[in-house]
């Protein structure tokens, strides 16, 4: 059995699943309101396990979405996942919220964008699942990056897309023009996304795993925004 937590967005989600051949079978899920994260997360995990007549001893791995997103939500989710992993000796897998968003689009080249507030966006560039860079950008910088020649499809989740909508007028190189809205990935999506690493035994060290907050940085962190080599 596997346990997944996602506390990065406006709601938190928990999922239980089991490996099923090449996929994962979701057994149970639960959602929490943002204001109840710190008080309700562990009790909800216990209740979800109890609903399947299971305990932490039955959990083979814990998957946690470690950001970017709500600083408070990330801290609560990550500290809970790390505490359970260390306390019960359970392997831990951390996944990026932007990577989940890119994967959910089912497109090969993606700019995944999540509203960071104050007209800023968390933006990640992914090519065939490979992380080419993640950065915190202003709305204007996001538009500039999204309209570069060869830019991937701009994908937004529950975010406000007002600041990035101008990209729709300059995406002639894209197979699909403009923002593609994807259902915000929940813990069940994170669980399925992490199955490849679970089967390969690729786990994170709880002692060294950090939150993926994403600070202000140069837009050239993204591959497509870097000057071409001469």
Regions found by a protein language model. Name each.
Residues 1-66, 184:
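N-terminal beta-alpha supersecondary unit
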Residues 20-27, 31, 36-37, 91-186, ...:
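Surface "functional belts" at beta-alpha junctions
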Residues 38, 42, 81, 187-191:
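A general structural signal for well-ordered alpha-helical segments in protein cores
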Residues 48-52, 87, 105, 187-198:
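Stable alpha-helical structural segments in soluble proteins, enriched in small hydrophobic residues
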Residues 61-92:
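DPxDG-like acidic metal-binding loop motif
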Residues 202-206:
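A short alpha-helix-loop-beta-strand transition element characteristic
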């Amino acid at each position: 059995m596997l346990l997944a937590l996602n506390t990065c967005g406006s709601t938190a989600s928990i999922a239980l699943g089991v490996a099923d051949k090449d996929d994962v079978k979701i057994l149970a899920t639960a959602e929490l309101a943002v204001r109840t994260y710190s008080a309700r997360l562990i009790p909800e995990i216990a209740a979800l396990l109890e609903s399947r007549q299971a305990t932490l001893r039955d959990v083979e791995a814990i998957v946690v979405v470690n950001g970017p997103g709500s600083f408070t939500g990330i801290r609560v989710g990550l500290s809970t996942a790390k505490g359970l992993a260390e306390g019960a000796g359970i392997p831990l897998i951390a996944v990026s919220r932007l990577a989940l968003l890119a994967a959910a689009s089912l497109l090969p080249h993606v700019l995944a964008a999540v509203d960071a507030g104050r007209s800023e966006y968390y933006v990640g560039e992914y090519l065939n699942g490979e992380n080419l860079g993640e950065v915190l950008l202003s709305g204007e910088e996001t538009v500039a990056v999204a309209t570069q020649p060869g830019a991937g499809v701009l994908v937004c989740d529950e975010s406000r897309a007002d600041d990035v909508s101008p990209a729709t007028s300059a995406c002639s190189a894209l197979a699909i023009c403009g923002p593609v809205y994807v259902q915000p990935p929940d813990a069940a999506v994170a669980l399925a996304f992490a199955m490849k690493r679970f089967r390969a035994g690729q786990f994170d060290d709880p002692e060294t795993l950090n939150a993926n907050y994403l600070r202000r940085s140069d837009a050239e962190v993204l591959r497509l925004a870097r000057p071409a080599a001469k």
